[in-house]
């Protein structure tokens, strides 16, 4: 029965994410285009909703006991969040630690295309990306770009230092 509840929670989460992809593309994105001054608050609220969407079904339907972290990370320039990447729940739990606003997550290049919700999310939030298979010259350019982004961004940057699994 517990296994069935886990699968049901996963199905509910996936359906919610697919519906959220449509909302994100057709409501959130255009809203930001019309009201760019509300970017941090709108994207922060949207990301908090997505974190809730991913974690809540596992608690309610699946019976999982997930941590509820304190909101301690300020949304301001110059904040670097370093986390160990253990599961797909790391990002939603990291988002729940923000006092306001949203995180810019350093992500792999392959996640920026053709993945429902995730690819559009990475463009909407302007996530910096890296390509682990890049040659030395490209890797140096990516590091320079990351340095520039980290100095200019208004929100915290999240990085998983161990890279890929």
Language model regions located:
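Membrane-anchoring hydrophobic helices of lipid-metabolizing enzymes
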Residues: 1-79, 92-93
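Soluble catalytic domains of membrane acyltransferases
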Residues: 60-165
């Amino acid at each position: 029965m517990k296994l069935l509840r886990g699968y049901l929670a996963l199905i509910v989460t996936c359906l919610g994410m697919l519906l959220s992809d449509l909302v994100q593309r057709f409501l959130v994105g255009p809203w930001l285009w019309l009201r760019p001054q509300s970017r941090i608050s709108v994207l922060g609220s949207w990301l908090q909703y997505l974190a809730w969407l991913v974690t809540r079904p596992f608690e309610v339907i699946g019976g999982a006991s997930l941590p509820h972290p304190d909101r301690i990370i300020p949304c301001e320039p110059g904040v670097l969040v370093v986390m160990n990447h253990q599961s797909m729940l790391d990002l939603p739990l990291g988002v729940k630690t923000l006092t306001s606003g949203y995180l810019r997550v350093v992500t792999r290049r392959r996640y920026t295309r053709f993945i429902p919700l995730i690819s559009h999310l990475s463009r909407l939030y302007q996530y910096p990306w890296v390509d682990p298979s890049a040659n030395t010259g490209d890797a140096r350019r990516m590091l320079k770009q990351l340095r520039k982004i980290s100095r200019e961004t208004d929100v915290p940057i999240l990085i998983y230092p161990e890279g890929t699994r």
